[in-house]
UniProtKB/Swiss-Prot annotation:
Keywords: ATP-binding, Ligase, Metal-binding, Nucleotide-binding, Queuosine biosynthesis, Zinc. GO terms for biological process: queuosine biosynthetic process. Zn(2+) binds at residues 198, 213, 216, 219. This is 7-cyano-7-deazaguanine synthase. Pathway: Purine metabolism; 7-cyano-7-deazaguanine biosynthesis. Its cofactor is Zn(2+). HAMAP family: QueC (MF_01633). CDD domains: QueC-like. It comes from the Bacteria. Pfam families: QueC (PF06508).
Length: 233
């Protein structure tokens, strides 16, 4: 990850790839703390639940962050993920065509997201792209590995004659450590009350770790992280 020195930050402008979930909300708080100015880019790509987009808007408004929402419907046409189908079971199912991966894996999603974010950053004159990818609570997603993001950064900069840097503050942090970072950056209450992680789109059940169904893998990981975070205090 880019070395963030005070002198470099005084003229740095960050773009957060922002879904409205726990990780990207934490990254938004982290970016606000470290960079001179911050924007957010959110992708409306036909995901299962509109609540993700709604919560991202709410969080961006509460933090006073400029948010660009890009709508496209490509993944549903390529269609190879339970995350795009409201009828699919996401509890512990394998991917339909890649059984060694979770059913929620969307092939090449991060590659496309980061490519579009890179193009937007060029247009806006932004110097850094912040993403919440993590290897610590590894879900089996190959596009959440450091090897992937470092190679993509180089490829995108070579292909556009740019020098935009990627930063990924959660790469080696598990969910408990992500809760701790949210607290450090002053956004823990916002993460608990407004961020959305649940694969089933449940905002009707409130637990100490936030809203969710408490049954899907995302809720399980978030609950486990919260309990570990509380135990560390």
């Amino acid at each position: 990850m880019t070395s963030l020195t005070p002198s470099a930050l005084s003229s740095s402008h960050a773009l957060v790839v922002f879904s409205g979930g726990q990780d990207s909300t934490t990254c938004l708080g982290w970016a606000i703390k470290h960079f001179k100015s911050v924007e957010a880019i959110t992708f409306d790509y036909g995901q299962r639940h509109r609540i993700e987009i709604e919560q991202s808007r709410l969080i961006a408004q509460k933090l006073g962050i400029k948010q660009f929402i890009l709508e496209f419907d490509l993944f549903s046409k390529l269609g190879d993920s339970a995350l795009l189908e409201t009828s699919s079971d996401l509890k512990a199912s394998p991917h339909r065509t890649k059984p060694h991966l979770p059913a929620s894996f969307v092939p090449n999603r991060n590659a496309l997201f980061f490519t579009l974010a890179h193009a937007y950053a060029q247009r806006e004159g932004l110097t850094h792209i912040i993403t919440g990818i993590s290897e610590a609570d590894y879900s089996g997603y190959p596009d959440c590995r450091e090897e992937f993001i470092t190679h993509l950064e180089r490829t995108l900069n070579l292909g556009s004659d740019s020098s935009i840097l990627f930063a990924y503050p959660l790469l080696h942090r598990n969910k408990a450590q992500t809760f701790a970072l949210a607290k450090e950056c002053g956004v823990l209450d916002l993460v608990l009350e407004e961020s959305h992680t649940c694969y089933n789109g449940d905002r009707s059940h409130r637990y100490e770790w936030g809203y969710g169904c408490k049954e899907c893998p995302a809720c399980g990981l978030r609950e486990k992280g919260w309990r570990e975070y509380q135990a560390s205090l």
